[in-house]
Amino acid sequence: MLSPKRTRFRKQHRGRMKGISYRGNRICFGRYALQALEPAWITSRQIEAGRRAMTRNARRGGKIWVRIFPDKPVTVRPAETRMGSGKGSPEYWVAVVKPGRILYEISGVAENIARRAVAIAASKMPIRTQFIISG
């Protein structure tokens, strides 16, 4: 699963997801892509599940690019812990995704295979997405 090698700080504020994605919203590498339509935190496990589903479905042919990276640590407090005594420990990593962001790209396969692979990857995502074609 994806996670940063090292970060400057162990814990982060939650922040908020306002507006649309102005970066990473165009197809850069492949021919077909999966684009987010809603804002969400996508965990490294979900990213990996989508990537695996796409590679299994595309089989030998085709190249896949993952265009998001989980660089935000999410902290969780232990169960049945009283309030106070600081922030919880970092538990997992998420990628902050805004509407319009490209999640995956694929090329080197026929459109029907790409559609099928992307649809399976989309079912692993916690948000509504759309299939787009470059050009």
Swiss-Prot record:
SUPFAM superfamilies to which the protein is assigned, alphabetical: Ribosomal protein L16p/L10e (SSF54686)
Keyword Ribonucleoprotein: yes
Disulfide bridges in this chain: none
Alphabetized UniProt keyword annotations: Chloroplast, Methylation, Plastid, Ribonucleoprotein, Ribosomal protein
Modified positions (N-methylmethionine) in chain numbering: 1
Processing after translation: Partially alpha-N-monomethylated at Met-1 (10%), whereas 90% of it is blocked to Edman degradation, probably by trimethylation.
Subcellular localization: Plastid, Chloroplast
Keyword Cytoplasm: no
GO biological process: one example: mitochondrial translation
Family annotation (PROSITE patterns): RIBOSOMAL_L16_1, RIBOSOMAL_L16_2
Gene3D superfamilies in alphabetical order: Ribosomal protein L10e/L16
Assigned protein family: Belongs to the universal ribosomal protein uL16 family.
Record's function text: Component of the chloroplast ribosome (chloro-ribosome), a dedicated translation machinery responsible for the synthesis of chloroplast genome-encoded proteins, including proteins of the transcription and translation machinery and components of the photosynthetic apparatus.
Name of the protein in its database record: Large ribosomal subunit protein uL16c
Organism for this UniProt entry: Spinacia oleracea
